[in-house]
Amino acid sequence: AVLYLPKVFDLPYGELLGLSSLGLVLFGLAALPAGWLGDRWSQIGMMVIFFIGVGVGSIIVGMAGGPDGLFIGLTLIGLFASIYHPVGIAWIVAWADKQGMTLGINGVFGNAGSAIAPVFVGLMIDFVTWRAAFIVPGALSILFGIGLLVVWKAGWIRDVTTDRTPTGAPDSSAFVRVFIVLTVTMACTGFVYTGLTNTMPKLMEMGLSAALAASYTEIGIFVGVISGLASFSSIFGGWMADRYSARSIYIVFWALQIPILFFVVSLSDVPLLVALLLVLSFMLAFAAAENMLVAQYTPFRWRALAYGAKFVLALSIGGLTVHLAGWLFDRNGDFAALFTMFGAAAIIAADAAFMLPGGRPKPVEAVGAD
């Protein structure tokens, strides 16, 4: 949509992209209170608010008559979307027998949305109207929230109060070290991942020839296919996270990204598509290990709050990255400087990962989730 709406509202690409900046910042900042409420009130109740709130924001965007309406709707989407990661991930981890694989499968479904969205938006723009691209999913989100509320009140689903498969307590001397490393790596993740996913459609518009992509639908299909294929690396990463240390996983997959990030903007056509697929796959591969680290080094009663703190850092930086990307593009006409920064961030993250503990806590006797 960000490729098409500048023509509708007569705005520069960077300025339109900037309308989502506050929403992306809130996507991160509001994760902390959302996580706290998930720990103190209800995981399911917060997810009901998530679905209904995101749906309302999306419909507002679809009905917008100008930049102000877009800004309000996108900001509401970011605010309510902040609930999912701290509350939803904590809920999933608590129910999981194999946390790594479960997180990996969840990642596939999460990224399936990212894969389908650009295709759906492209189809709506080319064959219906851009407004349908927001109003239709917004209405579905509200209906899903109402459905979740009904099954919750009927007692078919419940909140979780303990891990199904708890792990032994890790060495307390490693707490500070893990916290410092995660602060660095998650900041780098927010910077690179958000910047990559938000600039990928524009990179394709600039780098793909008309023979490959001549319409918004075709660009959307390429973005969707790459996101969809890359999402399967989440399963591989989850499988690895159940067997190997987060330290090894972090180092390998951050290091693999470094050369690609420095050179991707100089590529075009098929080499560009392959490079984007690889770098996105490498980023998604270590997500399960990162989330397991947070779970292993955090008491259950603070679990959602800890995930909230993680996403405050990563997603708030991501929101600023979108603003930076738009500003650099409007000034320079390309993303060369931005991706040089991404490559530098990958080097920093890979180096920081060497400080992580080499092992991982062992599972203790499993207990049922209440």
What is the meaning of each model-derived region?
Residues 297-332:
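A late C-terminal transmembrane helix in Major Facilitator Superfamily
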Residues 244-293:
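C-terminal transmembrane helical hairpin of 12-TM major facilitator-type secondary transporters
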Residues 73-110:
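Cytoplasmic helix-loop-helix junction between adjacent transmembrane helices
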Residues 2, 177-233:
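Extracytoplasmic gate region of multi-pass secondary transporters
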Residues 29-66:
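Conserved MFS/SLC helix-loop-helix module at the cytosolic interface between two early adjacent transmembrane helices
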Residues 24-32, 114-115, 227-235, 318-319:
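Residue-level signature of mid-helix packing/kink "hotspots" within the transmembrane helices
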Residues 5-6, 37-38, 120-128, 204-205, ...:
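Interfacial helix-cap and linker-helix signal at transmembrane-aqueous boundaries
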Residues 106-156:
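Helix-loop-helix hairpin linking two adjacent transmembrane segments in secondary transporters
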